[in-house]
From Swiss-Prot:
Role noted for this protein: ATPase required for the post-translational delivery of tail-anchored (TA) proteins to the endoplasmic reticulum. Recognizes and selectively binds the transmembrane domain of TA proteins in the cytosol. This complex then targets to the endoplasmic reticulum by membrane-bound receptors, where the tail-anchored protein is released for insertion. This process is regulated by ATP binding and hydrolysis. ATP binding drives the homodimer towards the closed dimer state, facilitating recognition of newly synthesized TA membrane proteins. ATP hydrolysis is required for insertion.
Residues involved in ATP binding: K27, G28, G29, V30, G31, K32, T33, T34, E234, N261
Name of the protein in its database record: ATPase GET3
Enzymatic class: hydrolase
InterPro entries recorded: Anion-transp_ATPase-like_dom, ATPase_ArsA/GET3, ATPase_ArsA/GET3_euk, P-loop_NTPase
Primary gene name: GET3
Upper taxonomic lineage: Eukaryota, Fungi, Dikarya, Basidiomycota, Agaricomycotina
Length: 330
């Protein structure tokens, strides 16, 4: 193990003032929401304004802060410069389908769209991304930094790869539009559609591609974007973290922080056999994590607490452990 380890805190994120997008992700149930809320609270202490977005369909932000959030940014109680919003992909899909039904006089297109929309693999991530796109220009100008509380690993990876996939797809569509546009327009007018609607559609696609290209560039810029991996000290979680790190590297998305949550630190005088057995197991996987990541990662160790971290006060208290290493009680 290297002697000059990187500091075991997330202070490096607070110090990097150029960061615009911060993602927190990992396996389900490892404390992603608590970590993202706590990080957002710490950022609010040193940045002008912070927006916390949940892209997890389970939406735990409302539970964590004990306050109802919606798809519109809402100020978090007890803070002047911290805002939160929860993106719901399912309702966004439903909205899109309803718009199609309104535009379609005989209703056939709408019902077909409904069947299609909910059957497409990855549609949740696509709609989450589309919802963020709606806010991206306005919000990124309004807020100095945006923190994402993401869905469990698989969803997150598809979500982060979506800009690249979409950029390529829209590029192909645009080239098809220039080749087949007149024919599509003719067919559309024969079927009762407006002749100009195809040109409008391709113009919209082209402008959307511009926005997506910009976001894609920002996501791949380590000065603008970073990903905080959250895990617990168990085999499956560590395995998933390694997979996440590999995938993020393949997508060229920066990651250099790992939060290891729910660690047991039993007192020496404790005679709890279960605690000591679990602690030995945790220490084994923690040693593996250090072996894998010490050279390039800040590894933050957080304890398993006796009570839930809920409400602004408890989250604020917990957030201090992200910037000051946890000291085990004697």
């Amino acid at each position: 193990m290297s002697t000059d380890l990187l500091p075991p805190t997330l202070q490096n994120i607070l110090d990097q003032t150029s960061l615009k997008w911060i993602f927190c992700g990992g396996k389900g149930g490892v404390g992603k929401t608590t970590t993202s809320c706590s990080l957002a609270i710490q950022l609010a202490k040193c940045r002008k304004s912070v927006l916390l977005i949940s892209t997890d369909p389970a939406h735990n932000l409302s539970d964590a802060f004990g306050q109802k959030f919606s798809k519109d940014a809402t100020k978090v109680n007890g803070f002047d410069n911290l805002f939160a919003m929860e993106i719901d992909p399912t309702s966004a899909i439903q909205e899109m389908v309803e718009q199609c039904m309104l535009a379609d006089s005989n209703g056939m297109m709408g019902s077909m769209m409904q069947d299609l929309a909910f059957a497409i693999p990855g549609v949740d991530e696509a709609m989450s991304f589309a919802e963020i796109m709606k806010h991206v220009h306005v919000k990124s100008m309004e807020y100095s930094v945006i923190v994402f509380d993401t869905a469990p690993t698989g969803h997150t990876l598809r979500f982060l790869s979506f800009p690249t996939v979409l950029e390529k797809a829209l590029g192909k569509l645009s080239s098809l539009g220039s080749r087949f546009g007149p024919m599509i327009s003719q067919m559309s007018s024969m079927m009762g559609g407006e002749a100009g609607s195809q040109e409008d559609m391709f113009a919209k696609l082209e402008s959307m591609r511009g926005v997506i290209t910009e976001v894609n560039t920002q996501f791949k810029d380590p000065e603008k974007t970073t990903f905080v991996c959250v895990c617990i000290s168990e085999f499956l979680s560590l395995y998933e973290t390694e997979r996440l790190v590999q995938e993020l590297t393949a997508y060229e998305i920066d990651t250099h922080n790992i939060v290891v949550n729910q660690l047991l630190f039993p007192k020496k005088s404790s005679n709890c056999e279960h605690c000591s057995v679990r602690q030995k197991m945790q220490q084994k996987y923690l040693a593996e994590a250090h072996e894998l990541y010490d050279e390039f990662f800040h590894i933050i160790q957080l304890p398993l607490l006796t009570e839930e971290v809920r409400g602004p006060e408890k989250l604020n208290e917990f957030s201090k452990m992200l910037v000051e290493p946890y000291v085990t009680p004697e």
